[in-house]
Structures are given as structure tokens and as C-alpha cells.
Regions:
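Conserved acidic, metal-coordinating active-site core of Asp-based
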Residues: 1-66, 70, 75
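Asp-based, Mg2+/Mn2+-dependent phosphohydrolase catalytic module
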Residues: 78, 82-115
């Protein structure tokens, strides 16, 4: 991946300009307030999670993921249980199964339910 930093914010205009410059060979996604990631068309966090699931012989239902921005969309889709950070991008909040204040608190709550 290539990460581009825009001090004045990662606007849709910047994302579209990067997409045009990439000529369809790569895909720009917003990854933070001031960041745009440029990814290969066939590779993202969801692809990486799928490889890890196969390697560990676990299925989607045995996987959970946390995300907060556009670069996490495929990751959340690949996980059996997906969490968006409450302060995250609205598109991620709509996609996720649940919303969380922070990862550690959510994991502690889930672990306490198992005891």
C-alpha cells in the first residue's frame, strides 16, 4: 500500500484525484482524517483476514474485527462479528454488527461473558 498524507484533510476531492491518477490499477480509500491509502485492486484487509483464516483453519464465524474507516470495510465484511468504533466513519458504522467505544473495553466485556 501507499499512504498519502493531506494536512488539510483527506477530502473526497483528493481521493478522486488519486483514483484518476492511478488509472484503475489501484484503489484509494480513506484511512483517517488526513490519510488516503492506495491499495492494489485485489488486496485489502479483508483479503489478509481470509488468508489468515485459511492458514489457522478457522471460519468467518470464529472471527471478529474492529474498524473505524473506509480502509476497514472489507475486513469487517470478512469477519463473523464486526465492530465499528463509535467515532468512526458513518459508512463503517452502518456496516458493522455492533459499535464500540474502544477495543479493550469491548474485549474485556466479551471475555467476562465467557467466564
Amino acid at each position: 500500500k501507499i499512504a498519502a498524507y493531506f494536512p488539510d484533510g483527506a477530502t473526497e476531492e483528493y481521493r478522486l484525484r488519486i483514483a484518476q491518477a492511478a488509472g484503475g490499477t489501484m484503489r484509494p480509500v480513506v484511512s483517517g482524517m488526513a490519510w488516503v491509502d492506495l491499495l492494489p485492486q485485489d488486496c485489502d484487509k479483508g483479503t489478509a483476514l481470509a488468508v489468515l483464516q485459511r492458514h489457522l483453519h478457522i471460519n468467518r464465524e470464529e472471527t471478529m474485527a474492529f474498524g473505524d474507516n473506509e480502509n476497514d470495510v472489507e475486513l469487517l465484511r470478512q469477519a463473523g462479528l464486526s465492530y465499528a468504533m463509535k467515532t468512526g466513519n458513518p459508512c463503517v458504522l452502518r456496516l458493522a454488527d455492533r459499535a464500540a467505544d474502544d477495543v479493550i473495553s469491548e474485549l474485556n466485556m466479551l471475555l467476562s461473558e465467557l467466564e
